[in-house]
Amino acid sequence: TPGPDTIVFTSDWEPQTSQAIVDRLVDLVSSGSLQPDSYSLGGTVEALEERVASDLGKEAAIWMPTGTLANHLALRRHCGIKSRVVLQEQSHIYHDEGDTLARLSGLNVIPLATDRPYFIADELQVALDQSVDGRVLNPVGVVSIESPVRRQAGQVVPWDEMQAISHLCAEQAIPVHLDGARLYMMSVATGIGIRDYADLFDSVYVSMYKYFGAPFGAVLAGSSEFM
């Protein structure tokens, strides 16, 4: 059985009891290795943000309590006044976040690849064209990709397809966000580095609790201006 310091990249990790979480936190505080932070400035939190940003090859990162919040704020920040978000129909954002993009930020989602793990660049191009060629101009503000896709048994968006989508969006000045909650697991499975994946995206979210064993938390990374 893996211990509390073990990192497992083959699953989402075993659920922890409240007592186990408290005991672990007490041990960490007692060790004297945690540096205090004030309003998220300095200390252990900032060190974590800097480490994740460095590992992903991004300029900056910010810790957040949940991945749902990280995804939401990233998409909202990218969109600005362009209120459309293209994503996978099987994504966590579409199915499991309570329509918060529409409820809280007035963003409208365009789900592609119904009952499939991913869409391809040609499908995306059709959606982008429809957003600008219709009777009312309503351009896409951001494209979001989840990989691995939990609802599709953890299937991974192929590297070539990720590259094609990233290049297509770059040509049209549309930012791309990676819901990389399981990015490290994907990297282990494919042999492609986490930085190589992150390079294709303007922003990346990674989970801190799934395989790292943290009680909760997420980190969102991107450019300094984006943050």
What positions do the PLM features span?
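Conserved PLP-enzyme active-site core in the AAT-like
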Residues: 2-227
